[in-house]
């Protein structure tokens, strides 16, 4: 991993980024008690949950929006945790997955769902055909990119 001497402005991977967790911004929301230690879940409104991955440097946030007949999961995080099992604990509604775009931190859990709605762009189509190899995602899990949320 590349680090700079100025950890405040290092946008690649700041040293010990996880020391600043939990983020103060989450304190104004109700934290939902749930058994998955990879994700934190916050109720933003009566019908919207934020599913937050604080164990990865990118601190990915997916959203579960509850409707009358279906729920929409906006992005499936980076694929480290079991996001499907988690959303099934939060709702009994059928789940429709919508990806905002096709970067790994937004589609990592797509394989857990049957139907996915994603933008129809040349990049998205190329990624769907190519897929991801272990070699292409290995650095996503290297060094300080991931920390152990069990140490909270």
Residue ranges of model-derived segments:
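Active-site HxH/HxHxD metal-binding segment of metal-dependent hydrolases
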Residues: 6, 80-152
């Amino acid at each position: 991993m590349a680090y700079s001497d100025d950890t405040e402005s290092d946008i690649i991977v700041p040293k010990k980024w996880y020391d600043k967790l939990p983020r103060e911004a989450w304190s104004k929301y109700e934290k939902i008690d749930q058994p998955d230690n990879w994700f934190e879940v916050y109720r933003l409104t009566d019908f919207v949950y934020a599913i937050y991955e604080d164990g990865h440097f990118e601190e990915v946030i997916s959203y579960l929006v509850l409707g009358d007949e279906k729920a929409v999961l906006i992005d499936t995080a980076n694929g480290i945790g079991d996001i499907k099992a988690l959303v099934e604990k939060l709702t009994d509604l059928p789940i429709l997955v919508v990806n905002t775009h096709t970067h790994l931190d937004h589609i990592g859990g797509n394989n857990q769902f049957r139907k996915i709605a994603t933008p129809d762009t040349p990049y998205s189509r190329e990624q769907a055909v190519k897929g991801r190899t272990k070699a292409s995602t290995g650095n996503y899990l290297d060094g300080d990119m991931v920390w152990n949320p069990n140490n909270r």
